[in-house]
Swiss-Prot record:
Species classification: Bacteria, Bacillati, Mycoplasmatota, Mycoplasmoidales, Metamycoplasmataceae
UniProt remark on cofactor binding: Binds 1 zinc ion per subunit.
UniProt-listed Enzyme Commission number(s): 6.1.1.7
GO biological process per UniProt: alanyl-tRNA aminoacylation
GO cellular component terms listed in the entry, alphabetical order: cytosol
Protein name (record): Alanine--tRNA ligase
UniProt note: domains: Consists of three domains; the N-terminal catalytic domain, the editing domain and the C-terminal C-Ala domain. The editing domain removes incorrectly charged amino acids, while the C-Ala domain, along with tRNA(Ala), serves as a bridge to cooperatively bring together the editing and aminoacylation centers thus stimulating deacylation of misacylated tRNAs.
Reaction it catalyzes: tRNA(Ala) + L-alanine + ATP = L-alanyl-tRNA(Ala) + AMP + diphosphate
Domain of life: Bacteria
Transcription regulation as UniProt keyword: no
Family: Belongs to the class-II aminoacyl-tRNA synthetase family.
Cofactor(s) needed for function: Zn(2+)
PANTHER family given in the database record: ALANINE--TRNA LIGASE, CYTOPLASMIC (PTHR11777:SF9), ALANYL-TRNA SYNTHETASE (PTHR11777)
Amino acid sequence: MKSKEIRNKWLNFFESKGHLIIPSKSLIPIKDDSLLWINSGVATLKDFFSGKKIPPSKRLTNSQKSIRTNDIENVGKTARHHTFFEMLGNFSIGDYFKKEAINFGFEFIFDVLKFDREKIFFTYFSEDLETLEILKSLNVPDSQIIKGSRKTNFWDMGNGPCGPNLEIFYDRGPKYSNRGIELLKNDIENDRYIEIWNIVFSQFNNDGNGNYELLKQKNIDTGAGLERLACILQDTPTNFETDLFLPIIKEIEKLSIYKYKIDNYFLKDKIQEKINLNFKIISDHLRTAVNAINDGAKPSNNGRGYIIRRLIRRAYRSGIFLGIKGKSFLHKMTQIVRDSLIYDIDVEKVSKIIKKEEEMFSKTISEGINLLKEKIKSKFPKDNSIDIENKSQVAKYFKENNLTFDFSIAFELFSTFGFPVEIIKEILEDEYEIELDISNLPKYLEEHANKSRSENSSAMQKVINSLELVKEKVSEFVGYSTLKTKSKILYLLNETEEIHFTNSENEISYLILDKTPFYATAGGQRHDKGLLIQDKNRIEVLEVFKDKHLNNVHKVKGKILKSELINAEVDSNIRIGLERNHSGTHLVFNALSREFGKEIEQLGSDNNEERLTFDFPLSKKPSWEEIKNVEKRVNEYINMSVDREYIITTLEGAKKLNAVMTLEEQEYMDPNEVRIVNFPKITADLCGGTHIENTKKIETFKIISLDSKGKNKFRIKAITSKKIVEEYLKDEISKNKLVLENLIEKNKSLFQGYKMNFSWSKNLDEQNEQITKHIDQARSDYKKLLKNSENKLEKLESDFSIMKFKNTEIIFDMNLKMASLQSLVATLREKNPKAIVILGSEISKGKFFICVGSKEFSAKDISNIIFEKYKGKGGGNNILSQGSIDKKIEKAEDLFELLKEKGII
């Protein structure tokens, strides 16, 4: 059955049951700060369920486009993980409840889709006896009903509506696993029993403290993955062989030197697995990029745009692995993606955006890979005994010699050649099994930006000084009162001489005008940006700086004729951003002085249109509470709506007025004519920069970081304007929620009953602080849980078999209880990061469940070797893998020899 038919059958069926069909909404949430993307069918209907809006019908159904990107690296490594998917849903808002919802499910599954009754299994919440009775009344055999726990069958976000849920599974048979119903009973990840439908019975309200009351209005919220249903109805090993993905894969094959092999799911050829993986990455990421761009997202360096950029780049790199030639290829498949779906997609627009992103990336990727290989080769012995193309040999050499890849080298490849650090990390870890810690990336980025600014400014100053043509101050700055002016070109220069014209739109030159509205970088404020316009030529102003005579020098790109007048136009949006942040710097200086006293002075500042920094001395590091007091005081100043005043006087006159002045301000100002920027009743400062007309126009002020810059020196980084602060908070909330989710999962690996109760404020600032506190709590809980597990381990460790080879330990035991395996392996893995942990439990006569964990080695590779030797099957990831085997591993020595033979150790 084709995917379009499945989708239509769903919508038509529920329409026949009185449901209103709701068209799929945009992937970009509208007025919902809690989501980066629409990630489920119910996400667009939340206002109906909460009562904020009246639904057009109490019965709704949809097929909703969704994106989830919290686990991008796992795409293609599992049978069903995608970044873009479609969720089929039916919803009742205070109308029908359990009996009708389950009956609808039965009718659709058995009468419409014609599933075999013997292959459908149900899991329910153990305390939900009503659901159990309904299932029995529908003649479901006891053998196909599995009792679930609160963890598996109770939908609860920690605060608000919640309730038990019924999960419906399809059994794909023993060819996907010899193990039977125990997989469902023990909630073991597998490819045999596939969850096709989840029906949530929203009947309780959690007050946030774990107290549950019955809701006055009971609701139904369901979700069925279209890709999963297609996989079953089209009888494919994974979702990637369905008609939603295969046409894209076939199109990729036309460009690749390789072929995608469907049967390799069963054959398990390692080389072909890698080939298939890259086909899957391209097909998945392309679907996401096409749909997200069509809905308004654009590749960029932050938020949604960064995710799209990352997906396109990952797909492009997979294309290189598959031997696809040319600067761009992904954009050619936009139409194929469009044809596999039902949504209106502007193929031309989307294709152009993807092509531009590809071409931009193609300039760095191929050279970057070669440079990366050279950096890896620098670690090899001088006898050239290691082949860089033999990736398993390289991986083994790095492990045996405890070699690492220095992050500073990775950053050098990024800063010098533009090779993205995330791509470097993926190549190292995926292809060479070399870990790369990128946690220091933000710090390196800031240091690199500061260094680049300094070097660039010095280089341009050298250009002007070396010509010795400009003998005095000849240029007037008029930017305090206007952003536009018609000017005469006094000097047109290149790097060696004075010139009369430039020939190319890409030619760089330097201008001094008789008058200019462009502010030059000085006093901690960055230069203005904008255009010079001469006839039809639009000349981009790249940078503005002062020469030794204090003339404003414009570094520009474009065609210019010196003899003609030129229009100078400052970008007003960038100017107002600069003014907000420069005025914000004055206010934060004053607020810091009021909080900490006379010890505060300005050691340095840097303001651009996006943010400000302020460096100051203090004998001890400020507490975050003190920093929040400073932030609060600045916002109070903003809300006072104080008009800015300019006072022109001499340096001596400024001193008599007690104006605040820094050495930097005194150095670049003419002592006979200095400017004081005065915000009455707040602060008066010697300053030549541009400033906001009224404090209210700063809108809002937020401190986003406090860093140490040496002994007793600190730097505040802050942002202004409602738009920038809101975007920052949304981005932080999104990132922090992912961190929190991962921490909760990590804690659950140590204690399955672990959970946290959430209650988020609608205020973004408060919500972000709440999430941060939950992150701190989760980290604290992890330490306690780990300690608790370690205490339990002390009683068991003497029974473990431990073998050591060079720096590698194998920790082994096959006689443990099933329930404790995962937490034991997780604890031992964290406690012994260089060890391979293999623990097992007998689950039936002659059958054993094993769990493998390691931080140094791939747990998945090790478990696959064990499954091959001991007739088993399972799955997992690089740090934790599990499954069953039909033969007991008798002793650690057997494992040691097996892993040594396979080149793991």
